[in-house]
Swiss-Prot record:
List of residues binding NADP(+): 164-166, 189
GO molecular function: methenyltetrahydrofolate cyclohydrolase activity; methylenetetrahydrofolate dehydrogenase (NADP+) activity
Entry EC no(s): 1.5.1.5, 3.5.4.9
Domain of life: Bacteria
Reaction(s) catalysed by this chain's protein: (6R)-5,10-methylene-5,6,7,8-tetrahydrofolate + NADP(+) = (6R)-5,10-methenyltetrahydrofolate + NADPH; (6R)-5,10-methenyltetrahydrofolate + H2O = (6R)-10-formyltetrahydrofolate + H(+)
InterPro entries with a match to the protein in the record: Aminoacid_DH-like_N_sf, NAD(P)-bd_dom_sf, THF_DH/CycHdrlase, THF_DH/CycHdrlase_cat_dom, THF_DH/CycHdrlase_CS, THF_DH/CycHdrlase_NAD-bd_dom
Family: Belongs to the tetrahydrofolate dehydrogenase/cyclohydrolase family.
Pathway(s) the chain acts in: One-carbon metabolism; tetrahydrofolate interconversion
Organism, scientific name: Listeria monocytogenes serovar 1/2a (strain ATCC BAA-679 / EGD-e)
Pfam families: THF_DHG_CYH, THF_DHG_CYH_C
Protein name from the UniProt record: Bifunctional protein FolD
The gene coding this protein: folD
């Protein structure tokens, strides 16, 4: 029976550490600031942004929310981002995705100053991650590495399989595992004999967006299984990309959904914002 990796508990520990560090900085008259830009009225995005704001404030950071209408022009959005780039009280900038179709996400991400890009999506940060240089790492992949390390497992020398090749999770988490000296395979919808490939993994990260996709025949006994999915099953109940009840028997460690990867994402955003502030102050 697999041991449950408690993402809530780990996220709380990391957030407490960030909060303590912010309190020390505030005593010196320095307060890290995070600005979130929300375009339109997507309810899921709105809920997510509210959570980010709440957690930012709990950590003692300055929190700014800029709301723009669905029909805002690309030019206007880019000028808002440029103003935030210049704002000395803001150290992290996040434009909530997805954006309306008439706006180029790529252009917006490229406009965010890479030293304030706490989402880790700017090409400079992506490039730094791939050459192993210190950079802002996308929040979910950064959280996944912390979850794996929390099991006490040494990543070096392990076989890792990542199912999913998105730019937001799959590719960066594969690169982070490689940077930790794991032997990494990226699998995806075109991979032949996927269960066999997955079964070789000491560490299996699943980010397919398909409810309960991974069954126990994908699992090497004792493997660490990280489920990035956030899906609904046939009864409309929240579940992951891994069939938890089936897989928990085989796994050594497994993240639940909810309560696994999810709580880590906002926590790593706060850690990135603190890192950005410290870097900017050091440069100045």
């Amino acid at each position: 029976m697999g041991e449950i990796i408690d993402g809530k508990k780990l996220a709380k520990e990391i957030q407490e550490k960030v909060t303590r560090e912010v309190a020390e900085l505030v005593k010196e008259g320095k307060q890290p600031g995070l600005a979130v830009v929300l375009v339109g009225d997507n309810q899921a995005s709105r809920t997510y942004v509210r959570n980010k704001q709440k957690r930012t404030e709990e950590a003692g950071m300055k929190s700014v929310l800029i709301e723009l209408p669905e029909n805002v022009t690309e030019e206007k959005l880019l000028s808002v981002v440029e103003e935030l780039n210049e704002d000395k009280t803001i150290h992290g900038i996040l434009v909530q995705l997805p954006l309306p179709e008439h706006i180029s996400e790529e252009k917006v991400i490229d406009t965010i100053s890479f030293d304030k890009d706490v989402d880790g999506f700017h090409p400079v940060n992506v490039g730094n991650l791939f050459i192993g240089k210190d950079s802002f790492v996308p929040c979910t992949p950064a959280g996944i590495i912390e979850l794996i390390k929390s099991t006490g497992t040494q990543i070096e020398g392990k076989r890792a399989v990542v199912i999913g090749r998105s730019n937001i999770v799959g590719k960066p988490v594969a690169q982070l595992l490689l940077n930790e000296n794991a032997t990494v395979t990226i699998a995806h919808s075109r991979t032949k004999d996927l269960p066999q490939v997955a079964k070789e993994a000491d560490i299996l990260v699943v980010a397919t967006g398909l409810a309960k996709f991974v069954k126990k025949d994908y699992i090497k006994p004792g493997a660490i299984v990280i489920d990035v999915g956030m899906d609904r099953d046939e009864n409309n109940k929240l579940c992951g990309d891994v069939d938890f009840d089936d897989v928990v028997q085989e796994a050594g460690f497994i993240t639940p959904v909810p309560g696994g990867v999810g709580p880590m994402t906002i926590t790593m955003l706060l850690a990135n914002t603190l890192k950005a502030a410290k870097r900017i102050w050091k440069m100045n």
